[in-house]
Curated annotation (Swiss-Prot):
Annotated source species: Leptospira borgpetersenii serovar Hardjo-bovis (strain JB197)
Topology with respect to the bilayer: Multi-pass membrane protein
Composition-biased stretches (Basic and acidic residues): 33-61
Originating gene: yidC
Protein name, per record: Membrane protein insertase YidC
Keywords annotated in UniProt: Cell inner membrane, Cell membrane, Chaperone, Membrane, Protein transport, Transmembrane, Transmembrane helix, Transport
One of the record's GO molecular function terms: membrane insertase activity
Phylogenetic placement of the source organism: Bacteria, Pseudomonadati, Spirochaetota, Spirochaetia, Leptospirales
Gene3D superfamilies in the record: 2.70.98.90
Cellular localization per UniProt: Cell inner membrane
Entry's transmembrane regions: 8-28, 413-433, 484-504, 532-552, 571-591
InterPro entries: Membr_insert_YidC, YidC/ALB3/OXA1/COX18, YidC/Oxa/ALB_C, YidC_ALB_C, YidC_periplasmic_sf
Cellular-component GO terms for this entry: plasma membrane
Family from the record: Belongs to the OXA1/ALB3/YidC family. Type 1 subfamily.
UniProt xrefs under Pfam families: 60KD_IMP
Length: 622
C-alpha cells in the first residue's frame, strides 16, 4: 500500500540512508497505466447546475425513489445468516447488510485462524454463543444505486422497504423493491457458503414495461456503493489520526492497483511534495472520477487487518468515484453509464465479495467446486487473479510473508507468546546477517583505532575544512579503511527492515498480543498519559517506555562506536537516535521491541569485537 506507507518509508530513508542516495530501494514502482485510462475531476455542482442535471435525468427516463417516502419502523424486518466465518445481519429497510461480523475460522490446512482477537462482541443465535468483530462500523453495506453524488454515502434506496425472502438451506437472502412509478424492479440476492470467506451478490434491474428502459447513461450516471469504510474502530474514544491512517479505499483499473486514505484527497503523498516545489496547489475537487475503456477489475475498502472487496464477475463497471470530502465514509463506489434494458429484460450484475483478514490464507477456497481455478462452472467464475494485490506490500511482500511464517513457527514450536517470538526472530536475523554485521563492527573498531590521528588532524586544520577533509581521506586510504563501511551493511538490509515493519504492523497475529508490561504488541507501549494540555492537545501526551529504551540503546551503541571528529560530525552521529525516537514513538510496540533487541545484540557484538581486537593487539605487542 504505497500511498499510505510512503511517509514511513521516507523516514526510514532519512534515518538509515542519510549519507547515501538509496531511495529507489524502498518504494515499489507504480504500475504503468495504459494510455486509455482517464482521470476526470468532478466538482460538487452548484444549485443551478444541479437543477439542470435533475431536469436532464427526468428527460432520460430513469426514476429513483422519492425523498418523501415515509418509512414505518414496524415494516423493517431483520434476519441473520450464520456461517463458519461470518454472522451477517440483514435489514429489509434498504434491502441491505446492516451489520457484518467476522469470526474465527478454519484455515485450508485445518488450522484455527483467530480473527475475533480484540474486544469481540458476544452474539447469541438460536441458543448458540458466538464471538465476532463488527466490520461495517454498524453502518452496513449497501449495494444500492444512486444517481446523485450528493447522496453518497447513503442512497435514497436505503430508505425504501424491500420485501425479504430467505432460504436457510443455501444461506441466501433475496430483497426486492419497485421504483415509485413501477417501471422497474430492483432485486438483490446475497448468497453465502458455509466454509468460505467469499459470498456472492447479484444486483438485478428488471424492466417492467413494454418499452426500452435507459437505466444508466452518460447523462444519467448511476453510482453503486458496495462496501463502506471498514472497521473495526474504537468504541470507547473518538477516532484519532493514527486510527484514520489505517482506513483506505482501493481499486484495480487497467492492470494498475491504487489506494487512498478514506476521506482524503486523491493527490498522493509524493504528488503533494512535487506540487509544493512546483507551486501547484494540488487541490482536489469534492469527487474524483476514474474511468477507463477497460473497466474496473475490482474495488474495495480496507483497515489495518481487514479488507472488503467487490469483484465484478460478468461485467466491467465503467469507472470508480472517489469521495474526497473530509471524514466521508462513501467507501468503494462503482460507476455505470451504459445500462439499457429491452422490454421485460432482466439485467444482472454479479459480484464475488470477500470480507476478511488481509492475508492470502483468508482468500483460499475450501471447496474445490467453488474454486474457479479448479471448477469451470463455479459460482465465482470470472474471479480476478489479481485480488491478492488488495493486501500487496510491494517488492517486500515475499520477505514480509516469509517473516510472518517464521514468527508463526517460532510461536508454535517454542514459547506461545509473540513477544518472545520477536526476540528469538531478532537473534536468528542477527545470526543470518552475522558476516555483514561483523564487517560493520570491525570497520567501526578500525575507525576507533584511528581516533588519535583523526583528533590531531581536526585540531591542526580546524580553520581549513577543505584541507582537513583531504588529510582525513588520506589517512583512511593509507590504513585501508572505508569510512562508509559501517553504513553499507545497514543499507543492504533496509528492504528487510521495511518488510519487518509491514509484517509486525499488519499481521493480525500481533493484534491484542501482550508481552511483559506491554498490553498489545500491535499498539504503542503507552504506560502513562498526561492530562490534556490547553491549546496544545486535547488528549494528553503518552509516555512510551519501549521507545525510550530503544533510543537509549541506540545512543549507547553510537557512543561505543564513536571516533574523534569535529563538532559538526559529532552532532550528526546523534541525529539518527533522535529521528528514531520520533519515528518509533507511535509505532507498534512489536516493531520497537524488535529494534531495541537488535540494538542490544549489536552492542554485545561490538563489545566482543573490541575485546578480541584488544587481546590480539596485546599478543602482538608481546
Amino acid at each position: 500500500m504505497e500511498d499510505r506507507q510512503s511517509r514511513l518509508f521516507l523516514a526510514l530513508i532519512l534515518s538509515m540512508g542519510i549519507w547515501m542516495g538509496v531511495n529507489y530501494f524502498f518504494f515499489p514502482p507504480t504500475p504503468k497505466k495504459t494510455s486509455e485510462t482517464k482521470e476526470v475531476k468532478v466538482d460538487k455542482p452548484s444549485d443551478d447546475k444541479q437543477d439542470q442535471i435533475q431536469k436532464e435525468k427526468k428527460e432520460s427516463r430513469t426514476t429513483i425513489p422519492s425523498k418523501g417516502t415515509k418509512i414505518i419502523p414496524s415494516e423493517s424486518k431483520k434476519t441473520l445468516v450464520v456461517t463458519e466465518s461470518y454472522i451477517v445481519e440483514f435489514s429489509s429497510l434498504g434491502g441491505r447488510i446492516s451489520k457484518f461480523y467476522v469470526k474465527d475460522f478454519t484455515g485450508p490446512n485445518g488450522e484455527l485462524v483467530q480473527v475475533a482477537r480484540k474486544d469481540p462482541e458476544t452474539l447469541i443465535v438460536d441458543g448458540k454463543t458466538y464471538y465476532g468483530v463488527e466490520l461495517s462500523r454498524e453502518k452496513g453495506f449497501d449495494f444500492n444505486f444512486t444517481d446523485s453524488l450528493n447522496e453518497l454515502p447513503h442512497s435514497e434506496w436505503n430508505r425504501i422497504p424491500f420485501s425479504l425472502a430467505e432460504n436457510k438451506a443455501d444461506h441466501s437472502v433475496v430483497f426486492s423493491a419497485f421504483s415509485p412509478d413501477k417501471t422497474y424492479q430492483l432485486k438483490k440476492t446475497f448468497r453465502f457458503f458455509d466454509r468460505e470467506n467469499y459470498f456472492k451478490v447479484t444486483v438485478s434491474v428488471i424492466n417492467l414495461t413494454k418499452e426500452k428502459l435507459s437505466f444508466a447513461s452518460q447523462k444519467n450516471v448511476q453510482y453503486l456503493r458496495t462496501f463502506g469504510s471498514l472497521g473495526p474502530f474504537p468504541k470507547d474514544r473518538p477516532l484519532n489520526d493514527r486510527d484514520t491512517a489505517n482506513f483506505f479505499r482501493f481499486y484495480h483499473l487497467d492492470g494498475s492497483f491504487n489506494d487512498t486514505l478514506d476521506g482524503s484527497s486523491s493527490v498522493g503523498f509524493w504528488s503533494s511534495i512535487v506540487n509544493f516545489f512546483t507551486g501547484n496547489s494540488g487541490v482536489d475537487e469534492s469527487f474524483s472520477l476514474k474511468t477507463s475503456t477497460g473497466g474496473v477489475d475490482f474495488a474495495g475498502t480496507g483497515s489495518r487487518y481487514f479488507i472488503a472487496v467487490a469483484d465484478p464477475l460478468d461485467h466491467k463497471p465503467q469507472g470508480i468515484i472517489l469521495d474526497n470530502r473530509p471524514k466521508n465514509e462513501s467507501g468503494a463506489v462503482l460507476v455505470y453509464n451504459n445500462i439499457t434494458l429491452g422490454p421485460g429484460e432482466v439485467y444482472n450484475l454479479d459480484f464475488a465479495s470477500y470480507v476478511g483478514i488481509r492475508e492470502s490464507i483468508g482468500m483460499v477456497f475450501h471447496d474445490p467446486e467453488l474454486d474457479p481455478s479448479q471448477t469451470k462452472n463455479s459460482p465465482f467464475a470470472g474471479l480476478s487473479s489479481d485480488l491478492n494485490k488488495s493486501f500487496n506490500q510491494g517488492i517486500t511482500t515475499p520477505f514480509r510473508n516469509g517473516i510472518i511464517w517464521v514468527l508463526k513457527q517460532i510461536y508454535r514450536f517454542t514459547i506461545p507468546n509473540y513477544g518472545w517470538s520477536i526476540i528469538i526472530f531478532a537473534i536468528l536475523f542477527k545470526l543470518v546477517f552475522y558476516p555483514l554485521n561483523q564487517k560493520q563492527a570491525e570497520s567501526m573498531k578500525k575507525m576507533q583505532e584511528l581516533s588519535p590521528q583523526l583528533k590531531t588532524i581536526n585540531e591542526k586544520f580546524a580553520n581549513d575544512p577543505k584541507m582537513r577533509q583531504q588529510k582525513t581521506m588520506e589517512l583512511y586510504k593509507k590504513n585501508n579503511v572505508n569510512p562508509v563501511g559501517g553504513c553499507l551493511p545497514m543499507v543492504i538490509q533496509i528492504p528487510i527492515f521495511i518488510a519487518l515493519y509491514t509484517a509486525f504492523s499488519d499481521t493480525i497475529d500481533l493484534w491484542n498480543s501482550p508481552f511483559l508490561w506491554v498490553k498489545d504488541l500491535s499498539e504503542p507501549d503507552v504506560i502513562w498519559t498526561s492530562p490534556a494540555i490547553p491549546y496544545f492537545t486535547q488528549t494528553g501526551i503518552g509516555l512510551n517506555l519501549l521507545a525510550l529504551l530503544m533510543v537509549g540503546t541506540q545512543i549507547f551503541q553510537t557512543r561505543m562506536t564513536s571516533v574523534s571528529m569535529d563538532p559538526n560530525q559529532k552532532m550528526l552521529m546523534y541525529v539518527m537516535p533522535v529521528m528514531m525516537l520520533y519515528i518509533f514513538w507511535n509505532m507498534p510496540s512489536g516493531v520497537t521491541l524488535y529494534w531495541t533487541f537488535q540494538n542490544v545484540l549489536s552492542i554485545g557484538q561490538q563489545w566482543v569485537t573490541n575485546h578480541l581486537k584488544k587481546t590480539e593487539a596485546k599478543k602482538k605487542a608481546v
